[in-house]
Amino acid sequence: MAENQYYGTGRRKSSAARVFIKPGSGNIVINQRSLEQYFGRETARMVVRQPLELVDMVGKFDLYITVKGGGISGQAGAIRHGITRALMEYDESLRGELRKAGFVTRDARQVERKKVGLRKARRRPQFSKR
């Protein structure tokens, strides 16, 4: 592995992201595509940039990311979690600031399973009194 390269794994819903950061000019590559090409929605791009903006390191690192599984929102959250972990590996003193913003904690919420006899996880069939 290259010198001064830092790694973080992020997960959210059913997505998993592997994030490699190394000093550079602020290039973000996700699955061999740029951030703008990969995420069409501006909100997803903002979520990915959040940890870097919080610690003022937007133009200081090049990010190489591979992400699998889930949808746009889950992948963006997984990438954010991975970037946060990689930044903490780079500099442990950033942990407090990142934790205060809520980026360190893995969001454990998962999709609730559909139950037998119900239409969805909790939605019951319509009740008819007569």
Curated annotation (Swiss-Prot):
Keywords: Ribonucleoprotein, Ribosomal protein. GO terms for molecular function: RNA binding; structural constituent of ribosome. GO terms for cellular component: cytosolic small ribosomal subunit. GO terms for biological process: translation. Pfam families: Ribosomal_S9. NCBIfam families: PRK00132.1. Belongs to the universal ribosomal protein uS9 family. This is Small ribosomal subunit protein uS9. It comes from Pectobacterium atrosepticum (strain SCRI 1043 / ATCC BAA-672). The lineage of its organism: Bacteria, Pseudomonadati, Pseudomonadota, Gammaproteobacteria, Enterobacterales. The gene is rpsI.
